[in-house]
Amino acid sequence: MKLTKTALCTALFATFTFSANAQTYPDLPVGIKGGTGALIGDTVYVGLGSGGDKFYTLDLKDPSAQWKEIATFPGGERNQPVAAAVDGKLYVFGGLQKNEKGELQLVNDAYRYNPSDNTWMKLPTRSPRGLVGSSGASHGDKVYILGGSNLSIFNGFFQDNVAAGEDKGKKDEIVAAYFDQRPEDYFFTTELLSYEPSTNKWRNEGRIPFSGRAGAAFTIQGNDLVVVNGEIKPGLRTAETHQGKFTAKGVQWKNLPDLPAPKGKSQDGLAGALAGYSNGYYLVTGGANFPGSIKQFKEGKLHAHKGLSKAWHNEVYTLNNGKWSIVGELPMNIGYGFSVSYNNKVLLIGGETDGGKALTSVKAISYDGKKLTVE
């Protein structure tokens, strides 16, 4: 699809351009939101979520390439799994799926895909924590996983709902009790986890010095880790951002400034934002929240998003010299897609937009310090 070239001023006088002449990527065969993916060499892998038990690949270096379906994922349909690539293979962990009773449940299994023979293998291991709302990235020979919901609490909520049957009164009581808790009482994962495929071992890489998160944007570039926002309890996000660094003594963390609020709006934090690097600049965009939830929480309302409507966003933020700024906007709101850094661009693959509609689009954004380009 060709876009008309347009320029306008944005915050800090950055130029925002729709590019009509750059490479475009084909749409996904199906809309994929709440899925996962990874980059292996020049090939991107995306699947699961609203894509069912399917995975698709695209050769990014071939301008004429189309998406291709690979072997069916053997772990069944699931939402919000975690994936990363190590040593030319794709690893998929956890997620949320229905059991034989029809209950939505967190699962903690693990699978490996080998591109050389198009085969999946279930691994003889289980994640030590719940992996829904978790975010993963690879570094060296390990997969690092940050955040996630508590398996027992999350599963218990869905089990109780199914057990309540058609009793609306009981269901309302279960929902009220679930959301009327402090953030710390959900026991979101507060350790940085790692999985090393060569030894099939999980490792506790240390406690993070900030609250547990679900749906945070999490990236690793070189020795730097960046964490942006995420839920601190169901329905309530935070605007906090953090940076870590791999050192001989483990990961050392520091706080970054909060994500700024768009002009005329409050900043209620983001979950499901997409992030990556372009020309050395860290970019984060999209995500969803409940505007007004932080205000209600500060007023003492533990069910912070009660009565509020979910909103999806399109602002593009960049981190430069430890400071955040808004450098432009996407042509649509987006969240809960897959993002990957490639060829000095951040590809935004699938996701959802207003009302939760699944997207098939593949957009590319780039930033050179002065101009944001959206393709």
Curated annotation (Swiss-Prot):
It catalyses: N-acetyl-alpha-neuraminate = N-acetyl-beta-neuraminate. It is an enzyme of class 5 (isomerase). Gene3D superfamilies: Kelch-type beta propeller. Residues 1-22 form the signal peptide. HAMAP family: NanM (MF_01195). Belongs to the NanM family. Homodimer. This is N-acetylneuraminate epimerase. It comes from Haemophilus influenzae (strain 86-028NP). The gene is nanM.
